[in-house]
Amino acid sequence: MASQPPFKTNFCSIFGSSFPNSTSESNTNTSTIQTSGIKLPVIDLSHLTSGEEVKRKRCVKQMVAAAKEWGFFQIVNHGIPKDVFEMMLLEEKKLFDQPFSVKVRERFSDLSKNSYRWGNPSATSPAQYSVSEAFHIILSEVSRISDDRNNLRTIVETYVQEIARVAQMICEILGKQVNVSSEYFENIFELENSFLRLNKYHPSVFGSEVFGLVPHTDTSFLTILSQDQIGGLELENNGQWISVKPCLEALTVNIGDMFQALSNGVYQSVRHRVISPANIERMSIAFFVCPYLETEIDCFGYPKKYRRFSFREYKEQSEHDVKETGDKVGLSRFLI
């Protein structure tokens, strides 16, 4: 049985028309252009624990500068064993290789309803359609993964333990530079509301360059991405879309909306997108650091750019905007 979702059939049932010729035509929210690829700042985390103060300070300075200028950076020597990524990728492939009819079943592998997602049910125009599928796994539900996928559950738990350690270190370093105490992040790293998103981007089924993931910012505090070497991630910088060159054995880190608000706009939550590969599949695993729904986000710094709001309020507003317009308006809703 086929594992790939019926993208063409689904698209035509929604829009009843042919797909735009290219992403440059379909991206109605910006007049930006495609540019050649860049290599994001690469930060060696081993310098934080090397015992050499000069290297540690330089590492922190590089991280802060990247978070301010790009909202993205890559990290190497993070201490996560290579086999953890290899085992996680293997389990990810097993999940996506299941027949489509099995993946869409309610409570597949005892994951919560709507954990499996594909296309873009919120799309209000052809420009907002995505040729991808994903498993959205909230960390508080990992222990519920069915016994027939015991290996998946064990490996996800190991992966989360490792990636969360790195995420907490980065959050505390960046937070300290904008006067946020490390205690602020303690409840966040109970990880009840954080989640993994396993992504599979399919080669274009429309005969043109299309989105694997439409332009957006992340709602999280921080996102850490493990990806293959296929490429396709692009970020918006100074009015241009820039393709990001994968760096072997590096993790990609990006600032989310919550950290931009908390830092009073010092750190940048940057719009990014994924272009579907031309003739090969692309896989990635994203870890999103999110607070409890009732966590209050209040800017550190004056004059404050954003009013105080809860994570629940932000999520509900974003979901409403997506339903109404197909796009998340984001932090501009909360400007003072």
UniProtKB/Swiss-Prot annotation:
Annotated SUPFAM superfamilies: Clavaminate synthase-like
Residues that hold Fe cation according to the record: H216, D218, H272
Residue positions binding 2-oxoglutarate: R282
Catalytic activity: gibberellin A1 + 2-oxoglutarate + O2 = gibberellin A8 + succinate + CO2
Molecular functions (GO terms): gibberellin 2-beta-dioxygenase activity; metal ion binding
Domain of life: Eukaryota
Cofactor note as given: Binds 1 Fe(2+) ion per subunit.
Active site: R282
InterPro entries: DIOX_N, IPNS-like_FE2OG_OXY, IPNS-like_sf, Iron_ascorbate_oxido_reductase, Oxoglu/Fe-dep_dioxygenase_dom
Enzyme Commission numbers on file: 1.14.11.13
Claim: Phosphoprotein is one of the keywords in the record: no
Pathway membership, UniProt: Plant hormone biosynthesis; gibberellin biosynthesis
Biological process annotations from GO: gibberellin biosynthetic process; gibberellin metabolic process; response to salt stress
Domain Fe2OG dioxygenase: 191-291
Cofactor (UniProt): Fe(2+)
Induction description: Not regulated by auxin. Down-regulated by paclobutrazol.
Role according to the record: Catalyzes the 2-beta-hydroxylation of gibberellins (GA) precursors, rendering them unable to be converted to active GAs. Hydroxylates the C20-GA GA12 and GA53, but is not active on C19-GAs, like GA1, GA4, GA9 and GA20.
UniProt name for this protein: Gibberellin 2-beta-dioxygenase 7
Organism: Arabidopsis thaliana (Mouse-ear cress)
